[in-house]
Amino acid sequence: MTTNTPTYIELSGEETKISGNLAEGAPMTDLSWAWSSSNACFPETQKEHFTGYHVLYYFDLPSYTEVEIELIPDDVDADFSLYAYEVGQVSENNTVPNLSSCVRCEADHKQDRKIRGRTQDHRRIVKDILAIRNPYQVVIGVVGAQGRAGGKFKLKIKRVE
């Protein structure tokens, strides 16, 4: 699997779960798409959290739907990161690293320092992925931090009421 070939996920019901492995992905040397003002996914100062293998997925987000995406590494000591972005329709031209702009991009990674009111464990959660009037497609990136190239994980996509 190359980094620009996301795997389709069919959402079923209120919650969809899949399993994966970082070894199924590939490194992404150009991360500048992430801190471009047209995407604003994560700042360049946080790029070390996204330097490992990237495994990409995508799914259809119907109108008037909001989802929360949770990444759960099998190894509680593994350092993984997560991002998700919305586009009209997934194509080679808007799949990272070729992403020039998107509707919304959110990311989560291990925090460099403690944040008041937030306890962090090995899980990563991306919120606020939503469609109002228009449906979108959402690309999910599961990434190893610090160059990590392997490790099993589970992804959970849950509809938010």
Regions found by a protein language model. Name each.
Residues 19-21:
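Short amphipathic
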Residues 1-11, 23, 27-28, 32-161:
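Acidic, Ser/Thr/Pro-rich low-complexity intrinsically disordered segments
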